[in-house]
C-alpha cells in the first residue's frame, strides 16, 4: 500500500486552531487519481485541500485544489498554505517568490521573510477581476430572504471573480452581519434562478455570497466579512476566504479608492479568527490585487492510498 506525505496548516492566522484549515498532499509521482483526490477531500471535509503534483526545477509547482464537492480552478487560502509547505519542507532553502500553476492561471506568492517561515507573511497577486453583474438591493433581500434594512443601500451589490465568483453584499453594521441567517433551499433557488448554481452556470461552479461591513470586532481592522457557499446541497460558512477577499479588494478599488490597504477580519462569528491583509491599486487600467496573511504549521503524517 502506497503512503503519501501530507501536512495540516491553518491559514490567515498566527495562532494554531484559528484561521482556515487546509491539508496539503505531496504527490509528485501522481499516485492519487482525480477520483481519489475528491474522495480524500470528502473524507477530511475541510473547505479545501491541495495536491502538489509536480515540482518544475524548484520554480513552478503544479497544484490541484479540491473542495468536498468538486475541483476548483483557484482558491486563496489553499494557495498560501501550499506555498508555506513548499517553502518549509520541499525546497532546499526558502525563496522570496513561489509560482503555483493552478487550473485557472499561474499565481505568484511572495514571502516577507525567508529567514523565519513561521513568521513570514505569504502574499499572492490575484488575476485581473471580472466584474460580472450588479444586483438591486431589493432583489437580494427577496432572493435570499433577508430584510432590506440589513443591507447598506448606499453601496452597490456586485458579482466579481478573480477565478471564483462571489456576490459582494454590503451590510449596514456589525450587529446586522452577526445576525445574518440564510436558508440553503432559498439560496439554491436564488442561484438557480440567476443561472449561478453549478447545474446551470457557465463555469459549472456555484457563485458564493460575501457579506461585508466596515464595523469590526477589533477596531484595528478595517472590515468584518462572512462568506457563505452551497456545498453538496448544504449551506457552509467559510472561516477565511482569500479568493473572496481578492474580489472584495477589486470592489473597493472600483467603488471607493484607486489605492487600498486594509485588514479584513473573517471567521470571528465561527470562533476561528482570521486576518486577511489587502493591498491594491489601479494603475494604467490594471488592477493590482495582493492578498496575504500568515500560516501556522499544525501537523503532518502519511496517508494510505
Label each residue range with its predicted role.
Residues 1-74, 80-305:
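Active-site proximal loop and beta-alpha junction motif in alpha/beta enzyme cores
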